[in-house]
Each structure stands twice: as structure tokens, then as C-alpha cells.
Amino acid sequence: MGELPIAPVDRLIRKAGAERVSEQAAKVLAEYLEEYAIEVAKKAVEFARHAGRKTVKVEDIKLAIKS
């Protein structure tokens, strides 16, 4: 884990209205976002394989998010 950079996550929290963000808060959110993204990606891969494809397409990602 820990592949997402902290700075963009910090900016996301600030976009949500925070004036200041602790490094630990940004790290925790980054970890959660990474875990969520991996789960979405795994589902998308399953959908692509079920469709007989090796390539994950936008529709696979959208379907994975909805499921």
C-alpha cells in the first residue's frame, strides 16, 4: 500500500472545505481511497474477463462502481 501521493489527497480535503489538514488525516484517506480503487479495479477486471476481453474499458469501471 501507500502508492497514492499525499499532496493530491490533501488538496481534495481542502477542496471539501478544510483550512488545514494533518498529514495523518491525508494518509488515512489516501489508504482508504487506494483500497477502494483496488476493489473497483478487481471487479472491473472480472467484468472484462466475463466479456471475453483482456482490456478493461470505461464501461467495466462504471459497472464496477455501481455494483
UniProtKB/Swiss-Prot annotation:
Provide the species name.
Answer: Pyrococcus furiosus (strain ATCC 43587 / DSM 3638 / JCM 8422 / Vc1)
Q: What protein family does this chain belong to?
A: Belongs to the archaeal histone HMF family.
**Protein name per its UniProtKB record:** Archaeal histone A
The annotated subunit structure for this chain is:
Homodimer or heterodimer with another histone. Dimers then assemble into higher oligomers, with the DNA wrapped around the protein core.
Please give the function described in this protein's UniProt entry.
Answer: Binds and compact DNA (95 to 150 base pairs) to form nucleosome-like structures that contain positive DNA supercoils. Increases the resistance of DNA to thermal denaturation (in vitro).
Cite the GO molecular-function annotations of the record.
DNA binding; protein heterodimerization activity
Q: Where along the sequence do coiled-coil regions lie? A: none
Residues annotated as region Interaction with DNA?
20-22, 54-57
Q: Which InterPro entries match?
A: Archaeal_histone_HMF, CBFA_NFYB_domain, Histone-fold, HmfB-like
Q: Which NCBIfam families match?
A: archaea_histone
Which keywords appear in this protein's UniProt record, sorted alphabetically?
A: Chromosome, Cytoplasm, DNA-binding
